[in-house]
C-alpha cells in the first residue's frame, strides 16, 4: 500500500545459509545383505576381493608399532614414506617427471579438489570452469569458496577449445577442471590432440588445469595434462574407486615447483593427515599383494558391467569394461527426471543427467548408474531388468 513503511523481516536464525544437500554416496551399508530388492546405483561400490583383509592386517601391524608413534603431530618428514608410496603407486600415470616432494596427501579426492581451489583462487569473484556436464564435487567445492562455476561446451571428445577460450576471457577464470581419461558422467575420453589444444588455450589465458583421474582403473590412454603443461597442471587421484573409499586417502600432484603452496594449504587447514593413516598408506600402497587385488577388483567390476550390457545393450548405452558406471541415453517418451522417479518406484536409485549440470544449463535426457558390487549379481541384474521394463514402456502422457 502506498505510503506505508518498508517492513524488513528478522532473519530466521535457524535457517541454513545453504540448502542441506547431502553428498552421502555409500550405496551399500556395512553388513547389508547382498540379496536385496532395493538396488542403489547412485555411486560405485567396490567388490571385496581381499583388500579388507589386507588392510586389517596392516592396521594391526601399525597399531602394534606405529612408525610415527601415537603422541606426535604430523610432520613433513614423518609423512615422507606415505608420499613416496603414493608416488610409486602413481608410477604408471603419464604425468611427466615427479616424485614424493611433488605429492600432497589429502582426506580423499574431494578434499584434494578443495585444497587446490584454496591454493589458487583469489580476488573478489573468482571463477572456475567446468565441463558442460561435470562431477558435482567441483561445483560443491567452488560454492564453499564463493566462486562462480562456469560450464563450458563439450563435444564427443571433451571440452571444445574455442569455448574454453571464450569462457576464460569473458569470466577472467583461474582454473579449468576436467576428467580427460574417464569423463564423469558420460565416459567420454579426450584424445591427445584435443588435450594439447586445451593446454594451449590454458597457456594463452593463464588458466590452471585440474585433472581429476579418480575413476581411471586401467592404463591411461594419453599423456596427462601435467606432462603436456607441467607448469600449470594439477593432478588428483584417490584409492576410493580402486581399493576402498573408507580410508579417505586422496593424492594431489602439484605442477612443477608449486608443491610448497599446496603443502601450506594442507598444513594451515588440518596440519596434515593423521599419522596412523599415513603409516598405513605407506605400507598399503607399495604392498606386493595390492596389484593383484586391484586387478581382481577391476575384473569383478567388468563382470557387473557385462551383465548390465547384456540387459540394457539394446538401448543407447555407453560403457567401458574397466569403468564402474554406465551412461544411458533414454529412448523417446522418457524424460530424465520422470525416469529416475519411476526407477526409484521400482527400487532402483540412479542419477539424472541434470545432477551433473549447472543450475541454468541444459542437460540431455540421460541417466548415470553405477556398479554396486556390494549387491549380488542376481539382485543387480533384477534391478536392471526392472529398469529395462520401464524403458520398454514409456508413459503415455499428452500435455494440454
Model feature map: region roles:
Residues 253, 327-329, 370-372:
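Short hydrophobic/aromatic beta-strand micro-patches
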Residues 55, 234-298, 393-396:
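Conserved core segment of the aminotransferase class I/II
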Residues 110-111, 361-366:
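A short, glycine/Asx- and small/polar-enriched loop/turn
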Residues 130, 151, 209-211, 281, ...:
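Hydrophobic residues in well-ordered beta-strands that form the structural core
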Residues 298-309, 317-329, 342:
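Conserved glycine-rich beta-strand-loop-beta hairpin in the small C-terminal domain of fold type I
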Residues 1-61, 267-273, 296, 300-303, ...:
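N-terminal basic, amphipathic alpha-helical segments
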Residues 69-205, 216-234, 392-399:
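Conserved core of the PLP fold type I
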Amino acid at each position: 500500500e502506498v505510503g506505508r513503511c518498508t517492513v524488513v523481516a528478522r532473519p530466521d536464525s535457524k535457517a541454513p545459509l545453504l540448502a542441506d544437500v547431502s553428498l552421502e554416496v555409500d550405496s551399500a551399508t556395512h553388513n547389508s545383505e547382498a540379496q536385496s530388492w532395493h538396488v542403489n546405483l547412485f555411486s560405485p561400490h567396490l567388490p571385496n576381493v581381499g583388500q579388507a583383509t589386507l588392510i586389517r592386517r596392516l592396521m594391526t601391524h601399525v597399531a602394534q608399532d606405529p612408525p610415527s608413534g601415537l603422541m606426535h603431530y604430523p610432520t613433513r618428514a614423518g609423512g615422507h614414506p606415505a608420499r613416496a608410496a603414493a608416488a610409486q603407486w602413481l608410477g604408471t600415470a603419464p604425468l611427466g617427471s615427479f616424485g614424493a616432494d611433488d605429492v600432497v596427501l589429502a582426506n580423499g579426492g574431494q578434499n584434494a579438489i578443495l585444497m587446490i581451489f584454496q591454493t589458487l583462487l583469489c580476488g573478489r569473484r573468482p571463477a572456475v570452469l567446468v565441463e558442460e556436464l561435470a562431477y558435482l564435487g567441483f561445483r560443491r567445492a567452488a560454492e564453499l569458496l564463493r566462486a562462480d562455476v562456469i560450464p563450458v561446451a563439450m563435444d564427443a571428445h571433451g571440452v571444445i577449445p574455442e569455448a574454453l577460450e571464450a569462457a576464460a576471457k569473458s569470466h577472467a577464470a583461474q582454473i579449468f577442471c576436467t576428467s580427460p581419461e574417464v569423463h564423469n558422467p558420460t565416459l567420454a575420453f579426450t584424445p591427445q590432440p584435443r588435450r594439447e589444444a586445451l593446454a594451449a588455450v590454458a597457456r594463452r589465458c593463464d588458466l590452471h588445469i585440474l585433472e581429476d583421474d579418480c575413476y581411471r582403473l586401467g592404463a591411461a590412454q594419453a599423456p596427462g595434462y601435467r606432462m603436456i603443461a607441467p607448469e600449470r597442471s594439477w593432478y588428483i587421484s584417490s584409492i576410493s574407486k580402486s581399493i576402498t573409499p573408507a580410508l579417505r586417502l586422496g593424492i594431489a600432484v602439484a605442477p612443477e615447483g608449486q608443491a610448497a603452496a599446496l603443502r601450506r594449504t594442507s598444513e594451515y587447514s588440518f596440519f596434515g593427515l593423521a599419522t596412523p593413516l599415513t603409516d598405513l598408506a605407506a605400507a598399503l600402497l607399495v604392498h606386493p599383494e595390492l596389484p593383484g587385488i586391484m586387478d581382481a577388483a577391476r575384473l569383478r567390476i567388468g563382470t557387473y558391467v557385462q551383465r548390465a550390457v547384456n540387459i540394457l545393450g539394446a538401448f543407447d548405452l555407453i560403457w567401458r569394461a574397466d569403468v564402474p558406471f554406465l551412461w544411458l541415453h533414454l529412448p523417446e517418451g522418457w524424460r530424465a527426471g520422470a525416469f529416475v522417479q519411476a526407477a526409484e518406484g521400482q527400487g532402483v536409485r540412479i542419477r539424472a543427467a541434470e545432477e551433473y549440470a549447472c543450475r541454468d544449463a541444459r542437460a540431455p535426457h540421460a541417466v548415470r548408474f553405477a556398479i554396486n558390487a556390494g549387491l549380488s549379481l542376481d539382485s543387480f541384474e533384477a534391478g536392471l531388468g526392472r529398469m529395462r521394463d520401464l524403458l520398454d514402456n514409456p508413459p503415455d502422457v499428452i500435455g494440454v
